[in-house]
């Protein structure tokens, strides 16, 4: 699972997901890509599940690029705990995804293979996505 080696602070504010993605919204490495259409937090587990789905389907052919990294820590309070006594303990890592963000890229395979692989990865994501091709 992906996570930062070290961070400056142990806990983080939740923040807002306003507007669309202006960085990471163009295909940079491969020929085909999966692009987010909605905003969401995507967990490290979901990123890994999508990556596995693509690599299993594409087998040895092609190369996969994961274009997002979970760098935001999410805290949770234990169940049936009273309010107060500080913020919860860090539980998992997420990547903040805005509409337009490229999630995965793939190259070196045919369009049909890429489309099916991306469809499998999209089913692991909590958001609507679209398949795009580099012009």
UniProtKB/Swiss-Prot annotation:
Residues 1-20 are annotated as: Disordered. One of its GO terms (cellular component) is mitochondrial large ribosomal subunit. It is found in: Plastid, Chloroplast. PROSITE patterns: RIBOSOMAL_L16_1, RIBOSOMAL_L16_2. InterPro entries: Ribosomal_uL16, Ribosomal_uL16_bact-type, Ribosomal_uL16_CS, Ribosomal_uL16_dom, Ribosomal_uL16_sf. Its main location: plastid. Keywords: Chloroplast, Plastid, Ribonucleoprotein, Ribosomal protein. Signal peptide: none annotated. It holds the Pfam family Ribosomal_L16. One of its GO terms (biological process) is mitochondrial translation. One of its GO terms (molecular function) is rRNA binding. Part of the 50S ribosomal subunit. Belongs to the universal ribosomal protein uL16 family. PANTHER family: 50S/60S RIBOSOMAL PROTEIN L16 (PTHR12220), LARGE RIBOSOMAL SUBUNIT PROTEIN UL16M (PTHR12220:SF13). HAMAP family: Ribosomal_uL16. This is Large ribosomal subunit protein uL16c. The lineage of its organism: Eukaryota, Viridiplantae, Streptophyta, Embryophyta, Tracheophyta. The gene is rpl16.
């Amino acid at each position: 699972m992906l996570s930062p080696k070290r961070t400056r602070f142990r806990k983080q504010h939740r923040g807002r997901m306003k507007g669309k993605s202006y960085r990471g919204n163009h295909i940079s490495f491969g020929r085909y890509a999966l692009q987010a259409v909605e905003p969401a937090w995507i967990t490290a587990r979901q990123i890994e599940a999508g990556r596995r789905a693509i690599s299993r389907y594409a087998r040895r052919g092609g190369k996969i690029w994961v274009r997002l990294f979970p760098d935001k820590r999410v805290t949770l309070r234990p169940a049936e705990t009273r309010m107060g006594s500080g913020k919860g303990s860090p539980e998992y890592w997420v990547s903040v995804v805005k509409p337009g963000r490229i999630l995965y890229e793939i190259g070196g395979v045919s369009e049909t293979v890429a489309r099916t692989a991306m469809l499998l990865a999209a089913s692991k994501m909590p958001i609507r996505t679209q398949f795009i091709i580099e012009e």
